[in-house]
């Protein structure tokens, strides 16, 4: 019953992007005292860690010949330098194009404001496998168990309805992998889109970055129109 309530009610909540209540200095007269700096200790791996794949292995898997309309499924075990090497999209230069293989576009039933970016999500389940719904003892903590080799892709783009253009900023991949010891884990990869020699290419950039972005569009839910730009759109560090 809890899950049904969540699924049927949350999409009806209004979208609110008014930042005014969060401008503490203007609204309440002062900002909160800053928190002490966070010191992150040096990373210490836990358990048995597989050696990193060799450059030769990465090159072999990422540059493999792939049939038209299929994804490069075998490459899920490595971090390809370019997003197009996974063959996830029908148009390698457009992550909003139809997905290859068994890719299934999906949307979330909860709203998440992402700095005026438009988001595209696609789930790729390996052939012969399936994602299994786990009811979590029949409560709101239900989850989906994805098989090894699953790739979840999420692209952030900026839309200009006046010019009828859309610019892809980044595509994030989450890939389910397995160690030689049988441990399952998810790896997050950050790909940043660039234009080179008239072509759009997304490069693996785990350290993230900063870019300029502009938007001009109307929200289909609220009807509100948003227009603006920034020179400091932050592309996240994958770590």
Language model segments and positions:
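Residue-level preference for alpha-helix termini and adjacent loops
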Residues: 112, 122, 157, 232-234
